[in-house]
Amino acid sequence: MYKRQPTDDDRAPGLTNSIALVDRRGWRAVAHKQLLPSYDVFDERRYFRPGTGPNLLQLPNGQRLGLTICEDLWVDDTLQRERLEGPDPIGQLIPERPDVVINLAASPFDADKPLLRQKLAATAARRLHCPVVYLNQVGGNDELVFDGGSFVISASGDPLLELPSCCDQISLWDSEANPANPDRSPDDPLDRLFRALVLGVRDYARKCGFQTALLGLSGGIDSALVAVIATAALGADQVSTLLMPSPWSSAGSIDDAVALAKRLGLKTTTLPIRPLMDGFNATLNPALGEDPNGVTAENLQSRIRGTLLMAVANQEGQLLLTTGNKSELAVGYCTLYGDMNGGLAVIGDLYKTSVFALCDWLDSPASRRCREDYSLPDHGELVGDAIRQKPPSAELRPDQKDSDSLPDYSALDALLKDLIQERRHGDDLLAAGHNPALVSRVEQLLKRAEFKRRQAAPLLKVSPQAFGSGWRLPIACG
């Protein structure tokens, strides 16, 4: 008996990603997404069947609306690296002569996206000889932050209307009115980045049922930045901090942490960990034949702090925010079940150099409007010069500095960006000017740290390539 082999259409999911028209008669689907991304964080072919075009809706007044969904607009090979094979939804609409084309999008934030979206829409508008209305979702969903920033582009590719990013806003655009250049606020990537992180924390907490958050304050720059973001997202009265000094914590770090909390209006509780360190030493000594030392002793300090943070967050029903950065996650300069403990890694997609840049901006006059918008102190220091200027240190042993174990962050981060985001390897890295010994060392560290990243808290994606669902590498790779 002959049995027909299943085709690709048979295997395709039955769902479509669609636009629905809602009116007095009810609702009906009027357009289906054609280009289904399956790269980075996107896996739409697993869930959806691609639609066919062109997608055109004629209104009762005779106006013809072209309809596209997110990736259907991303068909310019010159502007992006990830170009999907398949139909050209914009090209399909050209002979239909639409009056306006609308693109409904759920496009997650990264630092390069806002400008890229406008360039893609401008290219489409010039091809179609009609305005393009780009409408982007606003809000955080797990690791993704949808930053909004909707706009209208004229048939000649010029902006007609722009909405701010990372906030809900409704605006009316009259397609028959005389076009006017919109009021454009200065483009500030650090402003956009900070607002995206605040939105990500706010929505993650709200959607997970948390009203309050907790973090550990060390007096270092990473925890300081997370404290500022959390305060902006949730309010100072909803954020608590623990100071957990060890014998190796400097007086300056403790003072800096207390001063930061005072500037932000945060509650602080100090829990010295020396008694717990002594207890672990006494308990482990019979098994080890000596007190823990070296990296084991350093990791115990981090795990003691992680346990205290988890206990308080558990008891108080708080969201624990972990404070590690992308540079540390990349090379494994973090402690599993210690400083990695938490429900959300707020700056886990920020390289250390980006942390410094964002903190410098927060303490500059350029951040004043943003500080006012989030009810942060509108004058004076936020992070503080003492925190921004001190050499980074985990303070897990006497006189420890990050530079004892890691290369200079400017060299390390430049190499990590080429490895992770630009996907360069071997001769390409050497041609880019990276030190051969550093390349070999960092490549090995990046591979070996995968087991830690697999168990890390979810992080907020704010770069083109983040660790998380879009980063899929084996743990055991030889």
Please report, for each region that a protein language model flagged, where it lies by residue.
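ATP/NTP-dependent adenylation/nucleotidyl-transfer catalytic domains that generate, transfer
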Residues: 129, 155, 181-218, 223-478
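Enzyme catalytic cores with a strong preference for nitrogen-chemistry domains
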Residues: 1-216, 232-233, 268
